[in-house]
């Protein structure tokens, strides 16, 4: 009988110890991280992944989840109700449209950085190209540009060629792609002889050379704006992230990748 009482006493003590430690364990439980969904233009992929490392180190309660694609594709996804918190585009016009459609919160808009539009060829190319106007030459057979309906760099490219009066001669040579990264890839592999991309996309490849920069005034200013998506459930955290992008810390990373601060 004493043996039975001893066993029961031990079990009771164990139960009391377990119950007593439960609140403490609950208090020590790791708080759930805020998941921030950022829809961003594909040309920003490298720099934003770098920024993510720094941002999450400074904000351990936040986990950033990126969706990279052509600006127009992302715009359509958000318009169809895709869950997103932040939208960063490669053109002011796209953001203007989003504001007008009330798909983003207008007063959270931040104009982040600028970029240049450049003409690229393969380093092994024998083409004698020195300017965008040279794309009209007969020796150039195929020119890669982003599809203007969804890729801002593609629309900028057409703007430049119309400005120079050569679009009618170049449009038959134009190979339209789903994004600027594909344009770069096509030039690297020889699928096209030349391509038009953002400067920051060109300089990440060691197989290409920049032969010309679009003349000033030949296209609208290239600005990369960001804003909080209207249906975001993390609007405060989203705006804090946008503030970081335009902060000195964020701008330092952007400049490392070739982007220019806005003047």
For the regions a protein language model found, what residue spans apply to each?
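Periplasmic-binding protein-like
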Residues: 85-89
């Amino acid at each position: 009988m004493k043996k039975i009482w001893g066993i029961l006493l031990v079990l009771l003590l164990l139960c009391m110890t377990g119950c007593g430690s439960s609140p403490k364990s609950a208090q020590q439980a790791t708080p759930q991280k805020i998941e921030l969904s950022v829809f961003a233009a594909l040309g920003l992929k490298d720099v934003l992944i770098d920024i993510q490392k720094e941002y999450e180190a400074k904000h351990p309660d936040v986990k950033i989840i990126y969706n990279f694609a052509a600006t127009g594709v992302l715009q359509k996804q958000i318009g169809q109700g895709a869950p997103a918190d932040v939208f960063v585009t490669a053109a002011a016009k796209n953001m203007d449209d989003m504001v007008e459609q009330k798909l983003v919160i207008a007063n959270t808009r931040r104009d982040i950085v600028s970029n240049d539009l450049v003409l690229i060829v393969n380093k092994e190319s024998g083409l004698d190209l020195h300017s965008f106007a040279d794309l009209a030459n007969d020796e150039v057979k195929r020119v890669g540009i982003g599809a203007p309906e969804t890729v801002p760099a593609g629309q900028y490219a057409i703007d430049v060629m119309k400005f120079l009066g050569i679009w009618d001669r170049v449009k038959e040579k134009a190979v339209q792609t789903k994004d600027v990264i594909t344009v770069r890839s096509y030039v690297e592999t020889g699928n096209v002889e030349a391509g038009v991309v953002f400067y920051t996309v060109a300089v990440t490849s060691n197989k290409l050379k920049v032969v010309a920069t679009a003349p000033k005034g030949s296209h609208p200013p290239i600005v990369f704006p960001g804003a909080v998506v209207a249906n975001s459930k993390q609007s405060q955290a989203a705006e804090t992230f946008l503030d970081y992008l335009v902060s000195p810390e964020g701008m330092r990373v952007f400049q490392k990748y070739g982007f220019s601060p806005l003047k």
